[in-house]
Each structure stands twice: as structure tokens, then as C-alpha cells.
Curated annotation (Swiss-Prot):
Keyword Membrane on entry: yes
Subcellular location, record wording: Endoplasmic reticulum membrane
Transmembrane segments: 189-209
InterPro entries assigned: Sop4
Pfam family for this entry, one: SOP4
Protein's recorded name: Protein SOP4
Length: 234
């Protein structure tokens, strides 16, 4: 009878421990003097991705937003790997259309300790770097740890620049390319106009006043002959 009670108690403890293997991540966006209005809250989100080894068929993903106007947010009921000293890793991405936030990527670690408790760690994990320091490097760069209690703090770097969401897809030839380059420079445009005038003006004069045009050509030929004669006399 006693052995059956012990067996049932062990089974109950196992079930409780198995079902208790769920994690929670609490965070807060600290905007300092800036207020989190309803407009800002709808344009700010936090995405979570499970990486590394995972016990489920597919890695866990989730997106959450603010719980209140103080900037609190939470990921609850996260699946964790079973076993002593087993670790589960998540990566969190803060994103906002109004602010640039830091850190822009956070590595979160859940570790099952031998005493049955769950240890939560967080590290700043910037874009352009690996999730974990490479083991092949003699002196790998250590990730900077973050405070996780009572929450993980995400801070404001600065306001995001105004984004242009409307772009002209059919750009005119007068604003790009060789033609656009000439039209956008007053000196180049003046040179082109002068060249056109030198070519077109004699044609216009000949059409309007043939006698004057003939006189101009004769004068040009006379000056050319005088030039050659002066060179030959030397």
C-alpha cells in the first residue's frame, strides 16, 4: 500500500514538473519622459523566436504588444526543453515605427537547474553578430548580460527619422540620366543653349535674309584667305 502511494506521488510530481516546464518573459520599454500614447503603442511590437534545440515539431514564434501605457509587455506559457541542465533559447526583436530601440536583438536563455528551479538569463545580441560566440575563436567576445528581474528593459535610442512611404515609380527622363543631369545644372544648360544658337542662327539668317548670309560667308572666306596669305609671306 505504501509503495503504491509513493508511486502515485512520484507520478503526480512528474506530471506537475512536466506541465510546469513553461517559461515567461517580462519586459518593459523605458521611454523616459516620452509618453506611450495609443498611437505609439499600435506601432510598436516585440517578436520572439525560438532558436537552437527545441522539443516541439516547429520552433515557437510569437508577437506581443504593450499591456499598459507604462510600456510593460509579456510572453507567457513558453515551451521549454525538459531535463536537468537543459537550456532553451529565444531571440527577441523590439520594433517600432516611431523610435529606434536598443538593444535591437536580445538573446534569452532558460536553464533547468538541478534543484528543479528555472533560471532566466538575457544578453544583448546586436545585429550583424552570431547568436553565440564561436567556439573556434581563441578569445571569443562575451555577450553583455542584462537585468531580467523584475523585467527586461528595452530603451529608447532616438526617434526614428521620418520615412518616405510614397515613391515615384515612373521617373521622367527630364529628372534622371544625361538629360536630367544637364537640366539640373545651369552651367551645362547654358552651354547647350549656346551651342544650339551657334548652329541654328546662321540657318535662320540665311532663310530670312539670303543677301546678308552671303555677305557673312564672303567675309569669313576673305578673312581666311588673308590669314593664309600672311602665313605664306613669312
Amino acid at each position: 500500500m505504501f509503495s503504491q502511494i509513493v508511486l502515485l506521488l512520484s507520478a503526480f510530481i512528474y506530471v506537475v514538473s512536466a506541465t510546469a516546464r513553461r517559461g515567461t518573459i517580462k519586459g518593459r520599454l523605458d521611454l523616459a519622459a516620452s509618453n506611450i500614447t495609443g498611437f505609439v503603442s499600435t506601432r510598436t511590437s516585440f517578436k520572439l523566436y525560438q532558436i537552437g534545440n527545441f522539443s516541439t515539431e516547429y520552433p515557437y514564434t510569437s508577437t506581443t504588444m504593450f499591456q499598459d501605457d507604462e510600456g510593460n509587455f509579456e510572453f507567457a506559457n513558453l515551451p521549454l526543453n525538459d531535463g536537468v541542465n537543459e537550456t532553451t533559447y529565444y531571440v527577441m526583436y523590439p520594433a517600432s515605427m516611431d523610435f529606434n530601440l536598443k538593444p535591437n536583438r536580445i538573446l534569452i536563455e532558460f536553464k533547468n537547474l538541478e534543484n528543479g528551479t528555472l533560471q532566466l538569463n538575457a544578453f544583448k545580441n546586436f545585429f550583424g553578430r552570431e547568436y553565440f560566440p564561436s567556439k573556434d575563436i581563441t578569445y571569443p567576445e562575451k555577450l553583455q548580460s542584462m537585468k531580467v528581474h523584475p523585467y527586461i528593459t528595452v530603451e529608447l535610442l532616438h526617434k526614428a527619422p521620418i520615412r518616405s512611404y510614397l515613391q515615384a515609380r515612373n521617373v521622367s527622363i527630364f529628372s534622371t540620366g544625361i538629360v536630367g543631369n544637364i537640366l539640373n545644372s545651369r552651367w551645362k544648360l547654358a552651354g547647350v543653349i549656346t551651342l544650339i544658337a551657334l548652329v541654328v542662327f546662321p540657318i535662320i539668317v540665311e532663310k530670312l535674309d539670303p543677301e546678308t548670309a552671303r555677305a557673312i560667308r564672303e567675309e569669313a572666306k576673305r578673312k581666311q584667305r588673308e590669314k593664309y596669305a600672311a602665313v605664306a609671306s613669312k
